[in-house]
Amino acid sequence: MTTFDLDDFLKSYKPKKVDLSSYTNHTKLKGYTYITKDDFNNLIPNRTYIKYILRSDVGTENNISKQIHCGGFFLSGGNFSGKKFVQSDDWITWTHLFLKYCPHPESNLNGEFTEHKFYLKTTKYYLFYRYYDKKSDIYNLKSIKLKKIKKLKKNSDSKSMKKTH
């Protein structure tokens, strides 16, 4: 029996490369770029939208669409000290990203809009980002979607009118 030499193993070890092409080509990630910890300095608060995939989900299911999570707008990066999140400007030390998501803006009893804020542990997920030109106004996302729907409807109506004449 041969003896195991850890130093030799570590010198020759190459980690598995995960093929994310089936994810990056998916319509849910159209316009999004894969990001690693080395690129966290590219994240701009309130102008960067993050989507994510749980690392343990990759390659386990045929339905890729269910594995791509909608994420939220990047607010800040940092790490946890005890049970408290500590925001940091030093992106190299970030272990977590703080995101804001508001799927359906609704007001509470005080007339204030509710939103969902959460933390992502960076080593647990594959992250994808996309920039938005203007500072995010999470409550206007619904109106932006409605405008796009109206524009699409208007375009389809005008095309159907052209066909009938």
Swiss-Prot record:
Name under which the protein is recorded: Uncharacterized protein L676
